[in-house]
Amino acid sequence: CLSVCSMEYWPVCGSDGKTYPNECHLTSEACMSNTDITVAHVGKCDQ
């Protein structure tokens, strides 16, 4: 799994309903948790 992500803040909403700081963080979380998380949309998830 890729674990080094930039700290640039370009938030994306994952298909799991969580907001990630950027797409790299989402991809890393999906890999580490062995789940299929995709980008639902760019920007924060609606709470």
From Swiss-Prot:
Kazal-like domain mapped to chain residues: 1-47
Sorted alphabetically, which PROSITE patterns does this protein's record hold?
Answer: KAZAL_2
As one GO molecular function, the record gives: ion channel regulator activity
Q: Where is the signal peptide?
A: none
Q: What InterPro entries does the annotation carry?
A: Kazal_dom, Kazal_dom_sf, Prot_Inhib_GrowthFact_Antg
User: What Gene3D superfamilies does UniProt report for this protein, alphabetically?
Assistant: 3.30.60.30
Q: In which tissues is it expressed?
A: Expressed by the venom duct.
Q: Name one GO biological process term.
A: cell differentiation
- Entry keyword set: Disulfide bond, Ion channel impairing toxin, Neurotoxin, Protease inhibitor, Secreted, Serine protease inhibitor, Toxin
UniProt site positions, description: Reactive bond: M7, E8
A cellular component term, taken from the record's GO annotations: extracellular region
S-S bridge residues: C1-C31, C5-C24, C13-C45
The cellular location(s) given in this protein's UniProt record come to:
Secreted
Which family is this sequence assigned to?
Belongs to the conopeptide P-like superfamily.
Q: What is known of its domains?
A: The cysteine framework is IX (C-C-C-C-C-C).
Per the entry, what this protein does is:
Acts as a neurotoxin by inhibiting an ion channel. May also act as a serine protease inhibitor, since it possess the kazal serine protease inhibitor signature.
Q: What is this protein called?
A: Turripeptide Ici9.1
Q: Which organism is it from?
A: Iotyrris cingulifera (Sea snail)
